[in-house]
């Protein structure tokens, strides 16, 4: 909702979405998040844009952090953002992508812990939305987490799971374990 891009220099930054663009395609609810750019784009701007969209009559929510590690938050932690910031419903991360921070399974578990505590304390549920690239590891760390900690799978939301055939097959397995899968 605050635009994206920037991977080819400042001139490649994508502008913010407009209200007329949202209405033209029938959108009633949006989820804003930062992607690769957790530096020139700010969570404060994302929050302000979500509030502005709400003020204009649509529903808007946001994820805290961006592709990278350590997580970036508005307050002191991912859990604090979920608990105390009305618009925050989860956290963003990237993995298996050359732009990702290559998070370990333990790092992912620590973020899930924050999302889970913040989610149930705030009554929002909480979600860890994970951008996937096409690197060979795919979602293997998420599959390991799902196998060893089945109660945590409901907090995981991997996306772009159709980049490769191998990733698609992992997604099918993840879905069979009870996980959400997204093929956008």
What positions do the PLM features span?
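Generic structural signal for hydrophobic
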Residues: 22, 53, 171-174
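A glycine-rich helix N-cap at a beta->alpha junction
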Residues: 52-66
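Active-site-proximal loop/turn and secondary-structure-junction residues that shape catalytic pockets
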Residues: 36-38, 66-69, 95-97, 134-136, ...
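Hydrophobic faces of well-ordered beta-strands that scaffold small-molecule active sites
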Residues: 1, 30-32, 60-64, 87-95, ...
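Active-site gating/metal-coordination segments in enzymes
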Residues: 70-127, 180-182
């Amino acid at each position: 909702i605050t635009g994206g891009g920037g991977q080819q220099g400042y001139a490649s930054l994508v502008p913010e979405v407009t209200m007329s663009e949202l209405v033209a395609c029938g959108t009633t609810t949006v989820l804003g998040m930062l992607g690769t750019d957790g530096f020139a784009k700010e969570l404060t701007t994302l929050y302000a844009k979500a509030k502005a969209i709400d003020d204009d009559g649509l529903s808007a929510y946001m994820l805290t952090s961006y592709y990278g590690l350590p997580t970036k938050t508005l307050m002191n932690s991912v859990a604090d953002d979920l608990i105390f910031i009305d618009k925050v419903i989860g956290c963003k991360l990237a993995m298996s992508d050359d732009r990702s921070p290559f998070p370990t399974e333990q790092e992912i578990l620590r973020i899930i812990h924050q999302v889970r505590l913040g989610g149930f304390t705030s009554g929002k549920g909480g979600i860890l939305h994970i951008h996937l690239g096409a690197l060979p590891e795919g979602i293997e760390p998420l599959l390991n987490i799902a196998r060893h900690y089945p109660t945590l799978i409901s907090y995981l939301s991997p996306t772009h799971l159709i980049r490769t055939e191998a990733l698609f097959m992992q997604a099918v397995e993840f879905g069979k374990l009870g996980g959400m899968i997204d093929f956008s």
